[in-house]
């Protein structure tokens, strides 16, 4: 995969040289470039200007963004504008991006964008219902979430398939050694070696956690008959005040 990032602060992306994204680069699975669009700005390298009609703050000018993208060698890239008013970023969207060959991220700054910039983009995406100083942190988050889904980046395919949100549910609780730590013990079912019991326990705990913490995820979840029965059991227990 090839990723190009338009930003005023390329140095902010140093963390992407480490961990999973860094390893993807080392394996030759990822080619990532940072472009300071101030280098392409006319008018004394100014990238912002006052909005027509008045208003608070400054807007990112169209010219530096257009010129930067036009010099990037890409065949048919997915061009993503980081915008608080965009569509929410999700695990499903990250999985969609992981199938692409070329991605371009535009990191904004200031009060907003000249609307004409949006004629370049294929996607307007928001990290969440909050406002950041710029798009850099959002872009780093999206790149990390996407790159780890590229085949061969993680050691095992199942490493990300069991993640929270990949299945549509939150991930079940997990434990490692020792069995007893300060009086807190590992659930007996996980020590049983009984694969079917373990599978059912994990599914039930995943449903329970999702029901308690993110019930909104269940609204559009496609339940199997088994999952529906387990959820009904969980809700009945919760209604009765059981843990």
Swiss-Prot record:
Cell compartment(s), UniProt: Cytoplasm
InterPro entries: Alpha/beta_knot_MTases (IPR029028), tRNA_m1G_MeTrfase_C_sf (IPR023148), tRNA_m1G_MeTrfase_TrmD (IPR002649), tRNA_m1G_MTases_N (IPR029026), tRNA_MeTrfase_TRMD/TRM10 (IPR016009)
Keyword entries, A-Z: Cytoplasm, Methyltransferase, S-adenosyl-L-methionine, Transferase, tRNA processing
Top EC group: transferase
CDD domains: TrmD-like (cd18080)
EC number: 2.1.1.228
Assigned GO CC terms: cytosol
Keyword Mitochondrion: no
GO function term, MF aspect, one: tRNA (guanine(37)-N1)-methyltransferase activity
Reactions listed under catalytic activity: guanosine(37) in tRNA + S-adenosyl-L-methionine = N(1)-methylguanosine(37) in tRNA + S-adenosyl-L-homocysteine + H(+)
Keyword DNA-binding (UniProt): no
GO biological process assignments: tRNA N1-guanine methylation
Residues annotated to bind S-adenosyl-L-methionine: 108, 127-132
PANTHER family hit by this protein: TRNA (GUANINE-N(1)-)-METHYLTRANSFERASE
Assembly, per entry: Homodimer.
Its biological purpose: Specifically methylates guanosine-37 in various tRNAs.
Similarity field: Belongs to the RNA methyltransferase TrmD family.
UniProt-recorded name of the protein: tRNA (guanine-N(1)-)-methyltransferase
Gene: trmD
């Amino acid at each position: 995969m090839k990723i190009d990032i338009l930003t005023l602060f390329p140095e902010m992306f140093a963390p992407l040289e480490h961990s999973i994204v860094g390893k993807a680069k080392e394996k030759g699975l990822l080619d990532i470039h940072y472009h300071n669009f101030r280098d392409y700005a006319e008018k004394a390298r100014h990238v912002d200007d006052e909005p027509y009609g008045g208003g608070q703050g400054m807007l990112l000018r169209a010219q530096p963004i257009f010129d930067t993208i036009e010099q990037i060698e890409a065949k048919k890239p997915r061009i993503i504008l980081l915008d608080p008013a965009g569509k929410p970023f999700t695990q499903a969207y990250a999985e969609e991006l992981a199938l692409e060959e070329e991605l371009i991220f535009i990191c904004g700054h200031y009060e907003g964008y000249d609307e004409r910039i949006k004629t370049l983009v294929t996607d307007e995406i928001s990290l969440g219902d909050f406002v950041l100083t710029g798009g850099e942190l959002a872009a780093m988050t999206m790149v990390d979430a996407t790159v780890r889904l590229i085949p061969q980046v993680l050691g095992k395919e199942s490493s990300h398939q069991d993640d929270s949100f990949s299945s549509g549910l939150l991930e079940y609780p997990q434990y490692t050694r020792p069995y007893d730590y300060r009086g807190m013990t590992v659930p007996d079912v996980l020590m049983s070696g009984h694969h079917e019991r373990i599978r059912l326990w994990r599914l039930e705990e995943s449903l329970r956690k999702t029901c308690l913490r993110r019930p909104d995820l269940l609204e559009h979840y496609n339940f199997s008959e088994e999952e529906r029965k387990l959820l009904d059991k969980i809700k009945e227990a919760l209604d009765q005040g059981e843990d």
